[in-house]
């Protein structure tokens, strides 16, 4: 029997997604929820309606849960706006992606001890929401985390983090139990960088 047949769920993805969006749809379906098919590109958001107004309308339609992905950090404002709808973050710009961070931590836990592992994170650290959420979650454990990547893609993290940084990938790989590779977030750059080095 469905657990929540009377609950309505809407996914609002203002940035592209495949795995996160479909995973949330499958989870809602498995729980017996009614899934509202919402396509941002064919919605009133495209005609200039604010996200706040869209959410307000959904709340009036008795939608219970909104999974939201947005380029900006807006979810806290929306939570303050309505008490009749629950929100889950599907990712906010380069700020956070809590569900992916949790999945990554559980993946490491499946193979390694979260308190005694050497973990290397390689790639575009300054623009990765996945990196931010993984680091936030791993702060609860006693693993040694090393960062690696081109300095022009890691400068903000290097300046603000107390984690070890090694620019040379071959050196950074030595002694690691886990390597987390992050893609370059081309969509977050205002101008194209030369990253073919």
Region locations from a protein language model:
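Glycine/threonine-rich flexible loop motifs
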Residues: 183-197
């Amino acid at each position: 029997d469905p657990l929540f047949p009377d609950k309505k769920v809407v996914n609002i993805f203002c940035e592209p997604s495949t795995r996160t969006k479909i995973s949330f749809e499958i989870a809602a379906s498995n729980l017996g929820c009614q899934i509202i098919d919402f396509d941002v590109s064919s919605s009133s958001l495209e005609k200039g309606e604010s996200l706040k107004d869209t959410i307000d309308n959904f709340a009036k339609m008795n939608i219970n849960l909104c999974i939201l992905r947005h380029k900006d950090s807006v979810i806290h404002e929306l939570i303050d706006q309505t008490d009749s709808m629950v929100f889950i973050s599907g990712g906010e710009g380069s700020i956070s992606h809590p569900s992916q961070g949790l999945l990554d931590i559980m993946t490491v836990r499946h193979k390694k001890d979260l308190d005694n592992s050497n973990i290397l994170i390689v790639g575009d650290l300054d623009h990765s929401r996945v990196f931010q959420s993984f680091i936030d979650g791993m702060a609860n454990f006693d693993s040694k985390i090393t960062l690696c990547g081109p300095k022009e893609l890691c400068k903000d993290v290097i300046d603000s983090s107390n984690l070890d940084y090694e620019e040379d990938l071959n050196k950074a790989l030595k002694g690691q139990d886990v390597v987390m590779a992050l893609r370059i977030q081309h969509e977050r750059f205002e101008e194209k960088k030369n990253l073919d080095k």
